[in-house]
Each structure stands twice: as structure tokens, then as C-alpha cells.
Amino acid sequence: MILVKRIRIPGLETEKPRRLYVCLPKNYEKSDRRYPVLYLFDGHNVFYDSHAAYGKSWGMKEYLQKAKLPLIVVAVECNPEGFRRLFEYSPWDFSAPRPIGRVEGLGKVTMDWFTTVLKPEIDANYRTLPDRAHTMIAGSSMGGLMSLYAAVEYNHVFSRAAALSPVLWISPSKMKELIRSHRLADPTRIYIDVGTAETDLRYAAPAAVFETAKALSKAGADVSANIIPGAAHNEAAWEKRIPDFMKYLFDDMIRA
């Protein structure tokens, strides 16, 4: 069952309210069980092709129906206006190629809202396991960058993260310093990957993925770094990796 609400995020206003998706596991209403929660960026691209920016979603709805995982999935739509998604999903200011220009990094505003407003609301209204051990976050491209940022800077909230094709060319020195300055709690589990057929490998070059994975491991995380042969930088490619990253993030919870 997927519930869709319209919300506004203070400091990240849009002309129209954005969608918040909450996917509840099968038989949620027939039990009193509590569930882990996975938070996802780019919520419009997660469940429905009809909502997706380019007409193709991750197909997460179909995956969850087939996998029957005991999990709540919460996905938040980004700001679709102009280039505002880049602002919301960058932790740092940076200069982008024309016609974008200078980007003001509002990633901290985004994650402060996730952790101090959204998560408490989800925990209050649904039967979650609210502790760090059962709270995860994932995203692709700029959402992958934000997932890494969240896993490190908000490590007290998120114990697991998946970053699919993360945009690592944005302020690489700041990402290195962010990771270097943190000692990550045990457990911290992070999945990171990149495809070999991405349109522009600046966005997630294999070397940058392995360098980031090495730094995360040194900071205390268990890391799975993956190069995906023939995979492009799009939702169809990321959909195929859902079983892999979900198993890595979630498998021990199922077996526990």
C-alpha cells in the first residue's frame, strides 16, 4: 500500500506542494509489528512511471511486492522547478556548467528537515523501529551524493546508506574532508556503485567511487563498492541494482 501526501518543506519552497510517498508492507494493517524504514530521494522517480521525470521509475513498487520485505519505504519528491534540485541535493556551493551557473548548496537544510521534521512525523504516525540501527537512506546521482552526506554527517540517525552513481565531482575536497573528520559508529553499512556506460563519467568515475569507498572504510564503515558493466546513468539501470543494494543493506535484518 502506497500513501501519497502533498507537503511543503520550509526553506525549500516550491510553487506547488511536493509529493511524499509512504509505502507500507503487506499486512501492515493486520498486525502490530514495527518495521525498519528506508528513506529515498527523488520520490517521484521511485514508484510510478507516470510520476517519473523521464517516464521511467525505479520500479520499487514491483520490487517490494515481489520481495515481500518487512520494511516501510518513505520517498520525497525533489523540487522540479528549474535547477532547484541541484540546490536541494548538494551539501556545498559549487559552480556548474552553463546555463546552470552558481549553485547554492542547501543539502544541510534538506537533511535537517529529513531528520528533525520528516523522521519524527513518520515515527509518530507509523509503526517504525525508530532507532539508528533500523533507519536507512538511499538515492541515485545527486541523491546518491546526498545519501553519502547523510550517512556521514547524520551518522547518528542513519546506520545504512546506498549511493547509486553518486555525483562525486562536486566539491570533492569537501567530501574527503567530511569523511576524514568523522569516526562512523558501528555498524555503518554503505553500498556505492557506478556504471561503465554512464553518459559522463565525471558524475561518478570508477576511481572516485573506489577512493570514496576507501575513505569510508577507513572512517569505520563496512562498504560494498561496485562497478556495473554496461550500466548507464538512468532509472532503468538503477532499477536493476535494487536487489543488490537492498540485500546488502537489509539482509541481516531479515535473518535476525
Language-model segments: which ranges?
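Non-catalytic cap/lid and distal C-terminal segments of serine-dependent acyl enzymes
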Residues: 1-256
